[in-house]
């Protein structure tokens, strides 16, 4: 019962930022711009994904002092990233009071086999996923929120679209099997393909969606990108390099918030898309060497 209550509390926090935008920020000034623009939360980190991609090296948890400065400067929730499998980084982030930990493929993985046991923490976690199997495995580990991995730091939404479609197609298969009474196929799918408990599959079949909040992330650079992901069924969006690598961050931040909230209103999206200045310079995915792709980290 205690574990269930903890899961409910963690998922409850994730629902609080539903329909909102979480923005990457690297300092107090950016955090205040994000809050003024209407961000639901900020992600505090020392380097945005675009810089991590260019500069290379080992990307680790940010300096706790920087995270605390941002926490002191804003009234909205503050998230921070830990490396995949690095449970001590997560312990540190929990100890300084971050509102949510992102076990992130954007940072250099600390463990190439295991993710963090998120059920051992009171802080909620968000994790990336490219398909239904990855999403459900992270939820089984205790994740309270899922996001598409996309391909962070590219300004190119194509991978986020691919990952959201894969999750949706997986859910449709589960629902279809359930409606046709194909229980044996569901059991086989859970055991051999998705590698998750049958209870999670049953929950997906009943809800016809993931049992936790599911955000878009990775390559979102424009208001239209945000609205696209929302129309595909996302519950909100993370925007990393797309805001503060653009020509007019404050205006673009507000526009993305408006487009996320009004995702089904093309006239509003068109209006907020006017005169935003230059978007971040994007990268075509096929120009990225295989070993530099971030989304492949952590399955």
From Swiss-Prot:
EC number: 4.3.3.6
Binding site for D-ribose 5-phosphate: 24, 153, 219, 240-241
Residues that coordinate or bind D-glyceraldehyde 3-phosphate: 165
Keywords, comma-separated and alphabetical: Lyase, Pyridoxal phosphate, Schiff base
One Pfam entry name: SOR_SNZ
Pathway: Cofactor biosynthesis; pyridoxal 5'-phosphate biosynthesis
Gene3D superfamilies listed in its UniProt record: Aldolase class I (3.20.20.70)
HAMAP family given in the database record: PdxS (MF_01824)
Subunit and interaction comment: In the presence of PdxT, forms a dodecamer of heterodimers.
Family statement: Belongs to the PdxS/SNZ family.
Name of the protein described by the UniProt record: Pyridoxal 5'-phosphate synthase subunit PdxS
Name of the encoding gene: pdxS
